[in-house]
Structures are given as structure tokens and as C-alpha cells.
Amino acid sequence: MHTLRKHANIQREDTELKLALIGALAAVLLAPAVHAGETLDRVNSTKVLKVATNAGWPPQSFLDDSNQLVGFDIDVANEIAKRLGATAEFDTPEWGVMTGGRWGGRWDVAVGSITPTKPRSEVLDFAGIYYYTPYVFAVHKDSTLTDPKELNGKRIGVETATTSEEYVNRSLVIDAPGVPPVEYWLEPGEVKTYADSMLPFDDLRLGDGVRVDAVISGEQTVLGAINNGYPIKILSGEYAFQEPLAIVADKGDAEWTSKLGETIAAMKADGTLSQLTTKWYGKDYSE
């Protein structure tokens, strides 16, 4: 009797285990179908596009005198939303949070001039390149330096958790077709990092060599600072590197990423991106 009961218990446990394994396998197989296109469905339903961007990065995105977000990235995001039949709703998370992925539905897209790099590709999906920027070396207007190669051994300022920091640390790997490999020749004496894109320029404007000798940043950002009265200039000569910028989605929704990619391609084809880069930067950076 005990032997039969024990055998029956073993059979029941074995059956329950098999059913549990079948259920788990079914959940795994069905999960992509459940979540595929989830973001696009939500945007179509709510008519709202939740956009992550920056609040202090002129002329890409910044607060104007009326405390309203304006800039190139804001115009691009609004145009994407318009073409999707939605209205853009902006949020300005910390840079590392925005580029760290695992958004948990907080945002549908990031329009923040984000470079497609190998580490970011593990947690984000790149929908498409929408413009390019050369990274340049900015110095105080009173600096006697004339060539970027003279910056070896100098104090260099960069924004933290950006491609500028990766460049000075020689760890930058850009994950985009057609972009030449980064050449590392700069050997800074000291690297100073800052939590915001404009803070390095705030130190540089204090005087030649007062806190930093140079800042590495995108050409558009440097020109924006010059236009806003910062007493700085760009060293002529070679760029630090050429950077493609991508529209970004959270990892895992291929249908949504594809839809964004189609929208970006259409904006490039009809000249919208050319017009917007010219509007904000004075030249066409869309190609």
C-alpha cells in the first residue's frame, strides 16, 4: 500500500513538473507576440509621444526665457510626433538614466543627440541616424594655442558619461556604418569631468588656463556657446572624432523601432532634417 501511494505521488509530482515546464515554455514563446508593437499601439491610442531629452544643452535642447523647452532636438521630436499623429510630451531625465535603457515605459523615445556606441546597443535600440557632429577642441579666446596637438599634457574638460569622456579615456567605439574609426593621439595631463554639458564652458570662460585649458565638445554646442557670449574659440585643424547621432528607443520592441526608423528616413528624404539643422546650426549636418 505504501509503495503504491509513493509511486502515485511520484507520478503526480512528475506530471505537475511537466505541466509547469510546458507553461513556462509557452510563456516564453508567447511573450514576444504579446509585447510586439506595444509602444506603437500605445502612441496610436493615447495620441501622446513621451519623449526623453535634455534641459540644458543648447542649441540641441534648452529652456528659453519663458521656461519652455526649445532647440533642434525639440523641433525634431515635435516633427516625429506630428507624423505619428501624436503630440510630444517631454521629460528631462539625467543623462545616464536616459542612455542606460530599461525605461519601464516611462518614455517612448529619446531625442537627445545620443551616439550609437557598443555598450549602449546592449540596452537600447537605435532607430536611425538623424544628424552628425564633429567633436572639436575649444579654448579660451586669449589662448596662444593654435593646434590641437598642443593640448597634450594640458587640462581637458569634458561632460561625464559622454563620448567626449570615452574619447579622452580611449574607450570610444562608435557602432554605426560608414563612420571612420576613432584615432587616439591626445594625451591630456589631467581630465576634469562635469555633470552638465555647459559646465566645462563655464570654467573655460573664467580665463585661459584658470581651471581648464580646453574643452572637447560637439561643434554645434561650441558654436552655440560662442553665440551666447562665451569668450572661447575653436582650434582649427583636425577634429577629435566624427559622431553620428541617433533617435533611440528602449530595447526590445522591433516594430516600434522600425516605425521610428521609417519616420526618420522620410524626414531626411524630404529635406526636413536638412532644414532643421540649418535653422539651428547655420549649416546642414544631416548628411
Where are these regions (language model features)?
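Extended ligand-binding regions for polar small-molecule ligands
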Residues: 37-38, 74-83, 142-145, 149-163, ...
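Ligand-binding clefts/hinges and TM-proximal coupling segments of bilobed small-molecule sensing domains
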Residues: 37-38, 163-186, 230, 235, ...
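Extracytoplasmic small-molecule ligand-binding "clamshell" domains
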Residues: 37-113, 259-260, 267-270, 279
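Periplasmic-binding protein-like
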Residues: 55, 131-139, 185-186, 219, ...
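Acidic, polar ligand-binding/catalytic clefts
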Residues: 78, 82, 87-150, 233, ...
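Ligand-binding cleft/hinge of the Venus flytrap
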Residues: 78-86, 164-193, 207, 226
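Short helix-initiation/N-cap motifs at beta->coil->alpha
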Residues: 90-100, 143, 183-206, 220
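A ligand-binding cleft/hinge motif common to bilobed small-molecule-binding domains
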Residues: 96-100, 114-122, 166-175, 202-241
